[in-house]
């Protein structure tokens, strides 16, 4: 992934960290898939599987940051390499937060199951946004592995679709609660799930912004999408 250096050991260090970040991404992806399954099937077992995996994600984040700190201390990286290491650290933090959101979805599923709300809840409506968010994370990890700026820019664009799905679901959920007040508690759990899904999209967007920072040296956070597209073309 990174460009070659005079020190083969430095290249090895960078490649090891990159591999560990990608492995963490794979673990978090599996958490999301299991959380979506728990929601679609109202499966307490699947929800519990997501929750017990959370500590693996947390320990992976700590270990990657330890590796990054060690490389910075031993190698005295150049400005570009330091950008890469910083972006790896921030990407790791965002992946850990995606894991947190997956665990939050699982906990809300368990809360719904422990309540008395009817199974006619509009949970299936979340599948579209959940699939979009899961696909966006996969794309962000692919872009990270390749340092693919055009793909990163497309992720910024696609995150808007998840935001639109979230807004539409909230409107539908409000109507649902008004029609049947018995579902208010479970509907609020669904609202938290919808927000968690939306946040997964946001974290994927953050990773895309870090990719642009690594390759171009430009911090595009808080920059309008049209301006980013123009500067990257």
For each feature predicted by the language model, list its residue ranges.
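Cytosolic, long alpha-helical scaffolding segments
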Residues: 1-233
């Amino acid at each position: 992934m990174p460009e070659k250096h005079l020190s083969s050991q430095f290249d090895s260090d960078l490649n090891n960290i990159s591999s560990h970040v990608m492995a963490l991404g794979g673990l978090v992806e599996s958490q999301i898939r299991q959380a979506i399954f728990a929601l679609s099937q109202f499966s307490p077992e699947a929800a519990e599987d997501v929750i017990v995996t959370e500590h693996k994600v947390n320990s992976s984040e700590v270990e990657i940051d330890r590796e990054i700190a060690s490389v910075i201390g031993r190698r005295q990286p150049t400005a570009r390499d330091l950008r890469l290491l910083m972006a790896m650290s921030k990407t790791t933090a965002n992946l850990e937060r995606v894991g947190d959101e997956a665990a939050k979805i699982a906990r809300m599923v368990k809360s719904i199951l422990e309540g008395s709300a009817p199974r006619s809840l509009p949970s299936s409506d979340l599948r579209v946004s959940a699939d979009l968010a899961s696909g966006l994370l996969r794309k962000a990890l692919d872009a990270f592995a390749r340092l693919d700026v055009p793909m990163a820019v497309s992720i910024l664009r696609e995150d808007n679709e998840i935001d639109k799905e979230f807004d539409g679901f909230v409107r539908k959920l409000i109507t649902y609660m008004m029609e049947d007040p018995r579902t208010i508690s479970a509907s609020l759990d669904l609202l938290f799930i919808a927000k968690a899904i939306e946040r997964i999209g946001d974290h994927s967007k953050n990773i895309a912004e870090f990719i642009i920072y690594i390759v171009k040296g430009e911090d595009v956070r808080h920059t309008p999408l049209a301006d980013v597209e123009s500067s990257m073309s």
